[in-house]
Amino acid sequence: MANSDRPTIIEKYANRRLYNTGTYTFVTLDDLGAMVKRGKDFLVYDAKTGADITRSVLAQIVFEQENSHGAR
């Protein structure tokens, strides 16, 4: 498997900050939403426990996008 085929690893910290371990930068839910739209795979792990929290973060992205579109 080539490096480009591997999902990007995102770590979520207790302060709710999201860290892209591939680019060594903090990202936002909007950034992750853009990754979804581009078809870029990623996994989100809780930085403290190592638990896979990708599903809950994806749900949060959908929820926030629905709220922002409903507010218009």
Kindly label every feature range from the protein language model.
Residues 2-4:
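Membrane-proximal intrinsically disordered regions of secretory-pathway and membrane-system proteins
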